Amino acid sequence: MTTDSPTSRTSLLDVVAARTGKAPAAPRERRTRPLTGTAQHPLVLLAGGPKVGKSYALAAASADRRVARLAVVEVGGDQGAMDAYGAIPGARAELVEHDGTWADITAAIQAECAAEPTPGGLNVLAIDGATSLWAVLSREAQRGGRDLGPGGWAAVNSTWADFLTVLRTFPGPVVLTARVDGETIVDDALGRIRTQRDLAFETDVVVQATGHRRFTLAGARSLALSDVAESGPVELGDLVLADLFELLGADEAGAE
């Protein structure tokens, strides 16, 4: 039995070059870097049934002295709900206007991500809600009765993934609200969140409503909360988002 020597062995690049007639590209120099030990700004999923206080928690956060600015993108049936919460003492939430299409909603979000942060505290971006936003994307993709098929849905999911990547560029915490089908039972609710199927896994923190203005920390990808969350869901009571951000080290996230 004979074996190829390292100098005579045919590489995959050589095979591709032979079949396409194109010379293989020069190998790209790859680099590594050490871990920074600093957490990125968190993506928080705030999930619960209708009228349990998700939007209220956002508006109340804007009144907290630790929050310099809170911008809210209302989508679909959730539009207009935030206005009533302007009566909360000290509430300073700002509504981001758009025309309701996927293109304009995401353009508005990109503009928020690229804007200069307001000094003096946390900048927070809220998408209220992710359920309606996923419905907008899905509906537009199927416009005219188009049957997407597996390949088409893969493209839709890829577009959603790109959207989440944009959210990661925001200079502060991002909160996405979502609806949950049926009763809000933490043990099995993650499978019933009405939005893109992977959202609970792509976000860093999942907060679940268990009743009117009663919330539970269902999961967290955070060293700061790992010891707490390890023992199971943690009751948060009436959610104070600024407290959660502080526990997550959001004021230090992304610091150079």
Summary of predicted features, one role per range:
Residues 2-30, 36-42, 213-256:
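C-terminal regions of RecA-like/P-loop NTPase motor modules
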Residues 25-121:
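Conserved P-loop
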Residues 72, 128, 203:
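Residue-level signature of catalytic and energy-coupling elements of molecular machines
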Residues 104-123, 132-137, 230-249:
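P-loop NTPase motor domains
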Residues 124-197:
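P-loop NTPase motor core
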Residues 165-241:
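Phosphate-binding/switch region of NTP-binding enzymes
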